[in-house]
Regions:
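Secondary-structure transition/capping motifs at alpha-helix termini
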Residues: 32-33, 80-88
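Conserved nucleotide-sensing/catalytic segment adjacent to the nucleotide-binding pocket
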Residues: 85-155
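Charged, amphipathic alpha-helical linker segments immediately N-terminal to NTP-binding catalytic cores
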Residues: 1-39, 245-253
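Generic recognition of stable, solvent-exposed alpha-helical segments in well-folded globular domains
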Residues: 13, 17-21, 68-72, 90, ...
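Glycine-rich phosphate-binding P-loop
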Residues: 48-83
C-alpha cells in the first residue's frame, strides 16, 4: 500500500496538487507492475474516406510536460473532426501507462476520464459552451483551468495497441531541417529526446523559459529512476521492433503567435501521415 498526504494550507488548495499526488502513486504502482508510466495524451481515431470496411484507424500517444501542446493538439483533432474524423476516442488526457504484451506489442492505458485544461488554450467560447458539464477553476488567474469529461472508463482501461509514439516539442520553429513531424531512426535517438523532457514553460507553473524534466514526468519516474530506465529501454526497443512510429511532433505551443495555429498544424501534419494509407487529401 502506498500513502501520501497534502498539508492543510491555503497554498496547497489548488486542485492540481491533489490530482498529481494521486497520479504519482498510480505511476509508482504501474512501475512495480512492469508498466512504463507516461505524462501525455492518447487518442484513438478513425478517419473518413470510404474506410468503414477496411478501417483507417490509429492510436496516437503524445508525451510531453505541461504546456507542451498535448491536450491542445487533441482539441485541434476535435475541431478538424467534422471534416476528416469519423470517430475520436480519448484514452488518456494527462497520464497513462504502457505495457509490452506477449506478442511484443505496446499496449497503452489511460488513468482518468476527465481533462484538466487551460482555458487560454481552448477555442474561444468552447469551455462556456460546455458549462453544464464543466468545472472551472480560478478563472481570474493566469493558470485558469477547466475540468471536462472526455473519456469513458471503458476506453481508459481497455488497452489500445500503439501506432504512434511521439514527443510533443513546443519550443522549436519548423523549417526544412525541423519538420512538424520528425520520425526517429533508433531507440537511442528517441530515448535521448524523451529522457531530456524539454519544454518551453508558459508560466502555467512556477517555471518559465526552456526547462527540462526526466521523461517530462516528475510524478514517479525520478523517484524510481533505475526501474524507470530499465522499463523505458525495453519499451522503446519493443516500439521499433513492432513497427510503432516513434518521433516528435512540433506543436510550437510555447512560441508566441502559435498558441492556436501550432497545435492545429501539428494535428493536420499527423493526419496527413495517417491518411497516406488511403487517398484522403488534407490541406496543410
Amino acid at each position: 500500500m502506498l500513502v501520501a498526504a497534502v498539508p492543510l494550507e491555503d497554498r496547497f488548495g489548488y486542485f492540481g496538487y491533489l490530482k498529481k499526488m494521486t497520479l504519482t502513486l498510480h505511476n509508482v504502482i504501474m512501475m512495480k507492475r512492469g508498466r512504463l508510466p507516461f505524462h501525455g495524451a492518447m487518442v484513438h481515431i478513425s478517419l473518413k474516406g470510404g474506410f468503414v470496411k477496411t478501417g483507417i484507424e490509429a492510436n496516437i500517444l503524445l508525451i510531453g510536460d505541461t504546456a507542451a501542446g498535448k491536450s491542445e493538439t487533441l482539441e485541434a483533432f476535435r475541431i478538424l473532426g467534422e471534416t476528416f474524423i469519423r470517430e475520436m476516442r480519448i484514452v488518456a488526457d494527462d497520464m497513462g501507462s504502457i505495457e509490452i504484451d506477449e506478442a511484443g506489442r505496446l499496449i497503452a492505458y489511460g488513468t482518468e476520464i476527465g481533462a484538466f485544461i487551460r482555458l487560454d488554450d481552448l477555442q474561444q467560447g468552447y469551455a462556456f459552451g460546455q458549462i453544464d458539464r464543466a468545472i472551472i477553476m480560478s478563472p481570474q488567474k493566469v493558470n485558469a483551468r477547466v475540468v471536462l469529461p472526455v473519456a469513458t472508463i471503458e476506453d481508459v482501461l481497455k488497452g489500445y495497441p500503439l501506432d504512434y509514439l511521439l514527443y510533443a516539442n513546443n519550443y522549436e520553429e519548423v523549417d526544412p531541417e525541423h519538420p512538424i513531424l520528425e520520425q526517429f531512426t533508433s531507440p537511442a535517438q528517441a530515448l535521448n529526446v524523451f529522457r531530456e523532457g524539454a519544454v518551453m514553460a508558459k508560466g502555467t507553473t512556477t517555471s518559465t523559459g526552456l526547462v527540462h524534466s526526466y521523461f517530462a514526468n516528475i510524478f514517479g519516474p525520478p523517484q524510481y529512476k533505475e526501474s524507470h530506465e530499465d522499463l523505458a529501454g525495453k519499451v522503446f526497443e519493443a516500439a521499433f521492433e513492432s513497427g510503432v512510429k516513434v518521433g516528435q511532433l512540433r506543436t510550437r505551443l510555447g512560441i508566441p503567435g502559435y498558441e492556436a495555429s501550432g497545435p492545429e498544424k501539428a494535428a493536420r501534419a499527423l493526419l496527413r501521415v495517417i491518411a497516406t494509407l488511403r487517398d484522403i487529401k488534407i490541406a496543410p
